[in-house]
Amino acid sequence: MGTIWLISAASDDQDDAPPSDPRLAKGGRLNYINVDFHLPKARLRHAPYNLKPYKYDPKTSCGPGPPTQVVVTGFNPLIAFSKVTAVFASFGDIAESSNKMHPDTGSYLGFATFRYRDSKPSRSRPISITGADAAKRAIRAMHGKRIEANMVRVEYDAEGKKSSRMLVEVLQKGNETTPALGEPRIPTGPKPKEVAPGPPPTAPKGPAAHRGGLMNVQGVWVPKPRPDSIIEVEPVIGHLKHDPYIFVGHEHVPVMPTTVAHMKRRLKTYMFEDIRADRTGYYIVFQDSGYGRAEAERCFRSADRTAFFTYTMVMVLHLYGTDGKASHAHASDTRRRTRTPERKHVDEARPHREHDRSRRDEERARRDEQDRRRREDEADLEEEKRQRAKNYDPVLEATDVVLRGMKEQLIKIIRTKIAAPALFNFLDPVNHLAKRRRLNLEDPHSARLPPIVLDEFEDRSPVSTPNSRADPIERRTARLDVSALPRIRKVKNAGLNTRKHGFNDPFARNRPTARRTAFRSLHYRLRSDSEGESEDEAENRTSLGRDTEEPESRPRSRMSSDDEGDKDDYASWGPGDDDSMTEASFALGDGPGLAKKRKLDLQVETAIKRQKKTDEELFGVTIDRIGTEFPSREDSLEDVLPPGPGGGEEKDIGSSRLPTPLLQEGKAKKKAPAKTKRKSKKQLFEEREALKRQQQEIFEREALQSEDVDEVIPTPEPESEPKKSKVEKEKEKEEKVEKPALDENLYPSQKVSVLELPHDFRLDVGSLEELALGPNDQPDLDRLRKRFGRGKIDDPELWVWRRDRIRELNSTDGSAKTPVRIEGYYVPNPTGCARAEGVKKILNSEKSKYLPHHIKVKKAREERQAQNGKNAKDSVLAAAEAARLAAESLVAKGNSRANRANNRRFVADLNDQRKTLGQDSDVLRFNQLKKRKKPVKFARSAIHNWGLYAMENIPKDDMIIEYVGEEVRQQIAELRENRYLKSGIGSSYLFRIDDNTVIDATKKGGIARFINHSCMPNCTAKIIKVEGSKRIVIYALRDIAQNEELTYDYKFERELGSTDRIPCLCGTAACKGFLN
């Protein structure tokens, strides 16, 4: 039918066009059938399907397989190839890598090949990666990316054809450029441009000559004169009249042919036309337009004075060429005709339009540049994020953290455990004893006397003696070296200072600048402040050094040129060269406040007496008098006399008292003219003596006062305090007399409590009424009514009577005023307040003393022990017998007819289970426990906290309850126990099943956790295996009576050396005292 219809249609229309396809009537969409799944009629498709290729399978596929080699081009050949290898090694294991080099020059060409191999799972890559997948990942991740600012291309190169073709192209390009570079250097004759192209001047002028000349020109090819290199011979500046350019001088960047190409790559981001060069420098030429000038300005702003290899590009900008103005001005100047007003207006408006256009171009170029930079920054940031996410390895990061921590700990251990002990051992004074003796340095461990060493930081001894700081024993045993004694040097510029500043107060505290001793070691820094002296002695030494005038801080007039002149009279024994143990070494400065200063320690005086005879024998002089109580400096200089008879004997202390002030004044006046040569020195000396007479009276009184103490107590204890002087006693008497007599009632001498309360005071309404309180001290009833509501007590007298009656019933002595308390429970704090005692740990043994139930059990146990002691029976046997009799009586009472019927019924059920199951008896008992649980309850225990009690009689060997909790491992149990202790949970219920399993019933479990410990328990815990799992079940160890507490032995390990053992509170006769 269809064919007939087509023929008839053709005959009617007389049209040879083919009929339309009905399947294309609706655009090829057929709604009446799903052509994708049913194929009675197919959809018309003009092109075949693009089928997805089959995945390569090495077992079934043929051919070489997917490519595993890639070629990388575009990276900088000057960078280390290891960086490029490290980047591509992150995608898989590299089997082979090759950085292509030039076969002739050996230089790298900037492209390389990487062949990947199949990798096995490792620590860094837990998933295996095939070589084809690694190559695919490398192309997908690195194609078009940057490696150190250079964009690279990554492509497949399965057989190495691409890399070989690239190498051949590089070689061919080198062969083509080599003859061109060498051709200009071959000819040695004159340059071609100097040779005339026509015939010589002597040639004939006829037409033949012309024809012959033309034939010669055509036959001989003369090359066009062009520059032999990139560097132009003619100046370039003559061709840049209007073009904007940037000039870089040759003094900043040397002119070389190879530099132009590098400069073009350096400035490739700027739209320049060309870079030309001559002998003067480089010319970066831009387009003669507003856009070109904008690019020139941008290039100048960005690249001026930047690094170019090892040079600095110093640029000079020329926006309008060498003329320095716009090109349209030059074009308008060439026109000679006069302009019409309209033309003149147009010409005048043209610069403004050009300026506006150039400004718009500059703004557009600036916006484009900002957008481009922003896009590049964002792309770089995203690339950096991807690289960080790709290269992030938690194992490496953890390794770095651990290494840093180990380094810190190692440095800390070396500093504290190795360096510090070694330094302390090296600086130990014992190791430098010989060197100190050789250099005459003091012994740091020797008992230093505070008044002797007045300043440790001076570079000289206190009285300029040779060995005043050396060991006293060494000074006694060493040979006397007279030449080693120091010479008293003059004070530099002493007279100049006197003339400059006028009169100098000899008693002023002008301490000279102290310099460090050359032989000062650092061991004194390591010495403790408390070594060799107490805190009081350190304070006294500090105050003494601060308030007194030390020998080195005295005026230099006493040891100046006057002493230098008299030095020769005594040969090398100067009058001021005394030993450190003589009286001169203890001379203190003359100050107005010496009456209030501390006296010499009695220990120093004892040392003076002990060393007196030895010093006389050592120095060969006789010391007449030794002032024991602050002798003056002048007396100490006069006391050294030539040796006489009996000089080696020790004189009595009483004969060494200081003479009267008049005698000293006379001697000083006689001796002063002989010593003084200048009038100014004499005046200073007289003024000093006048002040000394006032101080000598104070010294005499103190010496007489302490004379008895010196003779009776030769070696007093260091803790004894010096007696007060007469002046101080008189002042104290005057103060006592001056105190006014005050009324004891108004101004009591002792502190009295503001509100005295009786010893039996208790806070109550009646007690408040008994206190002597004023109207302001009584409670404000109006304010109390506002804060609290009114209570309904009906009859007030009845309410008071009922309250007193309750107190009488609760009290032990039947008194309503005695508070209800437990004896021994409330223990007062030593300071009266627990907060004032600080934070301290309370031991378990101390905590158990304050438990009320334990106090009750303790009293019962003491009474029972006392009773057992009277009967002379063993306490353990007596307690066991009593428990057995009580259990038998209770069991006899409990065996009623109902219990016997229940037992028979349970026995019958048990026999049935044994016959059907044939299991162990423990399992049957456990099943019995599931059927009928023993009625138990928990309540306050007399042993500890809560306890579990039996609500009925329980026979022996009967199962009571299962210990239920959370099953955890041993390590988790230890962590939880520490966590419970830190969080304040005092009781943790952990029951061990075996070495690896623990039942934790602290937060999840049954009431079996409340069973307390006892040294004589009535229950026992067994571990049985039910259906493949271990269970903890509590059995009755003996017959248990109703309302009796259930206990079993915790069986803790013994800790005999522990300082905080857990006390046992069971109170039985066989109590061991501790759980652990």
Curated annotation (Swiss-Prot):
S-adenosyl-L-methionine binds at Y1050. Its EC number is 2.1.1.354. InterPro entries: COMPASS_Set1_N-SET, Nucleotide-bd_a/b_plait_sf, Post-SET_dom, RBD_domain_sf, Set1-like, Set1_fungi, SET_assoc, SET_dom. SMART domains: N-SET, PostSET, SET. Residues 174-210, 325-387, 493-599, 623-744 are annotated as: Disordered. One of its GO terms (cellular component) is Set1C/COMPASS complex. It catalyses: L-lysyl(4)-[histone H3] + 3 S-adenosyl-L-methionine = N(6),N(6),N(6)-trimethyl-L-lysyl(4)-[histone H3] + 3 S-adenosyl-L-homocysteine + 3 H(+); N(6)-methyl-L-lysyl(4)-[histone H3] + S-adenosyl-L-methionine = N(6),N(6)-dimethyl-L-lysyl(4)-[histone H3] + S-adenosyl-L-homocysteine + H(+); N(6),N(6)-dimethyl-L-lysyl(4)-[histone H3] + S-adenosyl-L-methionine = N(6),N(6),N(6)-trimethyl-L-lysyl(4)-[histone H3] + S-adenosyl-L-homocysteine + H(+). It is an enzyme of class 2 (transferase). Residues 934-1051 form the SET domain. One of its GO terms (biological process) is methylation. Pfam families: N-SET (PF11764), SET (PF00856), SET_assoc (PF11767). Residues 330-377, 544-561, 683-704, 720-742 have a biased composition (Basic and acidic residues). It comes from the Eukaryota. SUPFAM superfamilies: RNA-binding domain, RBD, SET domain. It is found in: Nucleus; Chromosome. Keywords: Chromatin regulator, Chromosome, Methyltransferase, Nucleus, S-adenosyl-L-methionine, Transferase. PROSITE patterns: POST_SET, SAM_MT43_1, SET. Component of the Set1C/COMPASS complex. PANTHER family: HISTONE-LYSINE N-METHYLTRANSFERASE SETD1. Belongs to the class V-like SAM-binding methyltransferase superfamily. The RxxxRR motif forms an adapter helix that bridges the nucleosome and ubiquitin. This is Histone-lysine N-methyltransferase, H3 lysine-4 specific.
